[in-house]
Amino acid sequence: MFPYVEDYDGYAVKRLMLENVDVLGYLSLGYLALVWKGPAVVRRLNGETNRVSNSGLLRYAIIVWNLLLSAFSFFGMIVVVPAFLTRISQRGMLRALCGNNDEMFYRSSAGFWIGMFVLSKAPELVDTMFLLLQGKTPPFLHWYHHVTVLIFSWHTYCDHTSTMVLFAAMNLTVHFIMYFYFAMCACGFKKTMRKFAPFITMLQILQMVVGSLVTTYSAYKVYTTPEGAAPGCHVSRANARMGVIMYMSYLYLFSEMFLNSYARPKKPVADPTAAGKKV
């Protein structure tokens, strides 16, 4: 289906990322500076009329951006997910997760999409720019998720972590749905699409549950492997630690967001006439 990726050289991509690892630091610091200073800059640009936030051009840009990311995730999903399921059927779940497979990771069509998935985490930072231009302040979960995924994905790909295939398959699937949802909301269907929001958050939470279980299992295998023995899982100790911390923090934050947004009852608005106050 994608003949142009048959000669994909993931090792070259890995070398490029390792040789330019400082760029990861610049991106992360620049992004955090954008989150910190961006709201004030946008307020000045907006003026009293919100000329930037209310711009029709901005709305169209948001629609196109989200549709592009949804399409990218869809094409990645339809390659990586079947490849991972085939690997499970051939090797079993545990060996599919923990076994080393250079050919699939760096040479196959699935490897191409895994590599592009990792590299896409840098342009995905533009999500935050669009949020700022709409006059919104990015919540902690938003920017924390973006910057940590960028760092973790970069490290995981360069470290050839075997569990990366599952992480990419899950994330591409969720992002295909999520970015399509954002595009439809920007098109003016927010009221219609709003009913699907809890289910998308539930999908994200499910992704974090699976990620937490897998990273915990891989960390257990890595730390219980005797000195000098073959690793029980093709994951480094550094990546195992990063994975556990990242996925468990996501699980907590997304669960908290779900509870606050959909599960906990909204506080009733106080009646101004209640204590004999005039209105």
Curated annotation (Swiss-Prot):
Catalysed reaction equations from the record: an acyl-CoA + malonyl-CoA + H(+) = a 3-oxoacyl-CoA + CO2 + CoA
Topology in membrane: Multi-pass membrane protein
Enzyme class: transferase
Pathway membership: Lipid metabolism; fatty acid biosynthesis
Location of the protein in the cell: Endoplasmic reticulum membrane
EC nos: 2.3.1.-
Keywords of this entry: Endoplasmic reticulum, Fatty acid biosynthesis, Fatty acid metabolism, Lipid biosynthesis, Lipid metabolism, Membrane, Transferase, Transmembrane, Transmembrane helix
Active-site annotation: 145
Any single GO BP term: very long-chain fatty acid biosynthetic process
Residues in coiled coil: none
Sample GO molecular function, one term: fatty acid elongase activity
Domain of life: Eukaryota
HxxHH motif (motif): residue ranges: 142-146
Xref: Pfam families: ELO (PF01151)
Residues annotated as transmembrane: 16-36, 61-81, 112-132, 138-158, 164-184, 196-216, 242-262
Similarity comment: Belongs to the ELO family.
Annotated protein name in UniProt: Fatty acid elongase 2
Provenance organism: Trypanosoma cruzi (strain CL Brener)
